[in-house]
């Protein structure tokens, strides 16, 4: 096999399709939201979702100490939210970076403008080098807007 540069690996792996979502996290009075793209469902029974989180991030620190986190997905028309959460978030009562949130019974933030959200209980943490893969079991989820509304915004 030939030597592959880090640049070639980065350019190539960026072509793997990935959804964008916001991970909501909380521990001991500190809240955060973080844009994430390494997201996948890993099991139907139990219902598990996995997310890759940078080991140097605030979100990693919070998720590593807490048993719960959220995954929030947004309309393709509402992309500004992802820019707002590329750096640590500022929390004020009912808001993260001025985005309205509601806290679950486990005190993790769900984003009021999300088209679907999942509350997850961490079942496994797998350190894979620069990132840790958190696997969580779905303990609650909701699609606040109608499926018809979502379909109307899809492009073929």
Language-model features, listed with the residues they occupy:
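Conserved small/polar residues in nucleotide/adenosyl-binding loops
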Residues: 148-155
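N-terminal structural module
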Residues: 1-73, 140
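Hydrophobic core residues within well-ordered beta-strands of beta-rich domains
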Residues: 116-118, 132
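Glycine-rich, pocket-lining loop/helix-strand segments that form or immediately flank
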Residues: 56-103
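Short, conserved beta-turn/loop elements at beta-strand boundaries and strand-helix junctions
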Residues: 126-130, 143-145
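Beta-strand-rich interaction surfaces with strong enrichment in secreted/lumenal proteins
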Residues: 106-109
């Amino acid at each position: 096999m030939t030597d592959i540069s880090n640049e070639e690996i980065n350019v190539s792996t960026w072509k793997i399709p990935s959804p964008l979502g916001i991970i909501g996290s909380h521990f001991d009075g500190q809240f955060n939201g973080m844009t994430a793209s390494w997201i996948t469902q890993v099991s139907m029974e139990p219902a598990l979702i996995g997310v890759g989180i940078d080991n140097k991030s605030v979100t990693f620190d919070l998720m590593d100490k807490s048993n719960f986190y959220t995954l929030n997905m947004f309309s393709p028309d509402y992309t500004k939210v992802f820019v707002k959460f590329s750096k640590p978030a500022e929390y004020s009562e009912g808001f993260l970076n001025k985005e309205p949130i509601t806290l679950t019974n486990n005190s993790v933030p769900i984003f009021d403008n999300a088209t679907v959200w999942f509350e997850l209980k961490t079942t496994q943490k797998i350190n894979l080098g620069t990132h840790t893969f958190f696997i969580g079991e779905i303990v609650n989820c909701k699609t606040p807007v109608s499926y018809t509304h979502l379909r109307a915004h899809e492009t073929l």
